[in-house]
Amino acid sequence: MLTKKEIRRAVLKARSELDSETAALAYQVICRRILDIESYERAEDVCLYMPVNNEVDVMLLAEAAMEQGKRVWVPKVIKKGEKDQAGEMVFNRYEGMDRTVTGPYDIVESLSEEILEPGKNTLVIMPGVAFTWSRDRIGYGGGFYDRFLQENPQVDTIAVCYDLQVVDEIPVGESDMKPDYVVSETSIYR
């Protein structure tokens, strides 16, 4: 089995080579699929992420969610710690792109100071680098989503990816959290 580092390198390279037209078609399909998932339909709070480096663009869901009366939230890293402490991730209220700023890790964050209090009607839509169809996930190595989900087991989770991000097997550790769903342009796995 390849190491997480080797898998990250290979998948990130493949994702970076995905042309913008193919990516756009894929993430439009992925977002439409999410709209039909029960945990999205019942969610009052929808946590999205600001895509970077050719990630699936789930911000297409922001407008639809707000039109449906859902509150939309995006991640923010706080207390960026020392070398041995990665920091903490919270979700701030999303109020539109004109109310954002580039934060740590060059990720766009909301300027809102309102922080999500996750509940049973909270849905977290999360990125990742690589996945298996048994819902194992490799992120970027910071553990932000894993820690957030360990602290908030009541939330529903959907991970999104392109088919090219799916691999046969991933080494998993005790702290690695599986999403409830993995959604790609061709499949939904639960």
Model regions and ranges:
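Conserved phosphate- and dinucleotide-binding cores of soluble alpha/beta proteins
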Residues: 81-190
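N-terminal active-site beta-alpha-beta segment that forms phosphate/nucleotide-binding
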Residues: 1-120
